[in-house]
Amino acid sequence: MTPTLRRKLQALAERREELQHLLSDPDVVGNNDTFRTLSRELSQLEPVAVALEEEARAKADLATAEALRNDPEMRELAEEEIAAAQARLEQLDAQLASLLVPRDPRDDGNLFLEVRAGTGGDEAAIFAGDLFRMYARYAERQGWKVEIESDSPGEHGGYKEVVARVVGRGAYSRLKFESGTHRVQRVPATESQGRIHTSAATVAIIPEADDVEEITINPADLKVDTFRSSGAGGQHVNKTESAIRITHVPSGVVVECQTERSQHANRDKAMKRLKAQLLDTERSKAAAAEAQTRKLQVGSGDRSQRIRTYSFPQGRITDHRVEGLTLYDLPNIIEGDLDALIGRLLHEHQADELARLSDSP
């Protein structure tokens, strides 16, 4: 660990001691808001304190074992204890470094998943359907809930476009690096001569905003359309124009919702998603600017960026943002086994963040 990172850890340890003193102050205890805020900050620093205490014990164990190494009768045991202590210190070093990475406050929250067919006609729509099913099955493995808010089926299967809300603790933290253009290479079912076709679909991961009520939108900037659709209301929604399409004219952002029985409920859902998308657009611009400055690939937030290729003939998935990230496990991944892929992306992002922290004073 670099000296800079070590100094940051020491600062966190000192802040923890300060918080412990503050939380015993009667004035702080008597102020519910302040007490709650400081208690939350203290709980976030506890893992750092625990890891530092474990590190101190491991260093003491190492020193004791090294002192015993000079004793011929204890040398073999000492060597074993030295190896164990060094291995533990390496683990703790990595753990402490990861605890330094600033936590995204949105990580535990829900998200909106948007998948749209790109170039490739019917095959692109089928691929968009495959991607949506991949994420839905991954969500099921995680115990999350997937609620479709709007969809436009492809003529030969899949989706021209599908939007869903993914509900579950940690959903955004696991899927936030999936935004971008996904490309597929395979022989379509309709291809009689066995030629490989290339098509694409785009994925957008938008965190559900907790503070959407604080976002003010001028009603004059909105164009609201109603239409008939099928959905949760069954035949009822086919008879009434309960589905809602809202266009935010200044930005061009369009959202739809057609899953509820009433127009009012669909409008409420659509407005929440619109506000979340506008907020995410601003954050994405900032993330993209930072990524450009720091030459980052993972976490850039650029949805036009080609991030991944799925080569069915070779059973291979390549993520273009991380050098050497190619997995020959496409059949399982497309069925929702995304942990290995997501784990590599999270590790790369953590490395980027640690590099930034090391460069900062």
UniProtKB/Swiss-Prot annotation:
The keyword Chaperone does not apply. It is found in: Cytoplasm. PANTHER family: LD18447P. This is Peptide chain release factor 1. NCBIfam families: prfA, PRK00591.1. One of its GO terms (cellular component) is cytoplasm. The modification N5-methylglutamine is found at Q235. SMART domains: PCRF. One of its GO terms (molecular function) is translation release factor activity, codon specific. Residues 288-307 are annotated as: Disordered. It comes from the Bacteria. InterPro entries: PCRF, Pep_chain_release_fac_I, Pep_chain_release_fac_I_sf, Prokaryotic/Mito_RF, RF-1. It holds the Pfam family PCRF. Methylated by PrmC. Methylation increases the termination efficiency of RF1. Keywords: Cytoplasm, Methylation, Protein biosynthesis. Belongs to the prokaryotic/mitochondrial release factor family. Peptide chain release factor 1 directs the termination of translation in response to the peptide chain termination codons UAG and UAA.
